[in-house]
Amino acid sequence: VATIRLSYALDLRYGVLVDIAESVRDGRPVDLGMGAVSVIWQGDACDLILRSLDHVSTPPFVLNVSGLQPVSVTDLAVGMGHLLGVDPVFEGEAPTTALILNCSRMAQTVGDPEVSIRRVMDWTCRWLQTNGRTLGKPTHFNVRDGKF
């Protein structure tokens, strides 16, 4: 048995980066209700989860799967703004706390993500610039009260 907790896998059609990039591109304020996020490219998440099958056990093998370092929402917006040629607009102030996963056990047992967040930012912005289809479903990553 394995218990896997996945935090914000990224896809070009859906995810935290799509939410932020669309806001930046469209001139809408980026909500700083959550100051940082744990994110991972979906391909890496699938790879690491499959590797975890070698570790299933009783009691359950427990694993957090996401990026190894939290990423600032402000930094993501500024970086994607640069790629999109738009200065981001922000709403609110980033709190000092965030829902972040500790993925050190993941790194020790099944490895590190291979695709950098910077690369996914570039892919996401190019996807949106070429009118790539999105799922149109926000992640609500910035919500702190659990009401989506």
For each of these PLM feature ranges, what is it?
Residues V1-D44, M80:
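NAD(P)-dependent short-chain dehydrogenase/reductase
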Residues D11, V37-G43, G67-V71, A98-L101, ...:
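Residue-level signal for the nucleotide or nucleotide-sugar donor/cofactor binding architecture
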Residues I20, M106-A107:
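Structural element of the ATP-grasp superfamily
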Residues S23-G27, S52-V56, W127-N131:
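Generic structural signal for alpha-helix termini and adjacent loop/cap motifs
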Residues D31-G33, F61, V89-G92, G136-P138:
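Short, hydrophobic secondary-structure boundary micro-motifs
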Residues G43-D54, M121-C125:
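Amphipathic alpha-helical segments that line or abut small-molecule/effector binding pockets
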Residues L48-R105, D145-K147:
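Mid/C-terminal beta-alpha module of Rossmann-like enzyme folds, strongest
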Residues I117-F148:
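Amphipathic terminal alpha-helices
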